[in-house]
Amino acid sequence: QRVGQAEAWLIQHGFDQVRVRSHGLAARVEVPEERIANLLQPLLRRELVKTFLSLGFTSVSVDVEGLVSGKLNRV
């Protein structure tokens, strides 16, 4: 539920391709590589962190590789 809410927040803020991975209470955000800079704009980044913490995550990170299909299937 927390992941779905986090992804919905990102979509509401203009990110059409998103993935939030939950590692316990830590959230890892994946957006396309070309959108990472947008995600890290200071105002948006602060709002993202505040929102994700309010959803129950204790930390938030951004995957600097970007959103890559099949990433978890790598050997």
Where does each model-flagged region fall?
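ATP/NTP-dependent adenylation/nucleotidyl-transfer catalytic domains that generate, transfer
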Residues: 1-75
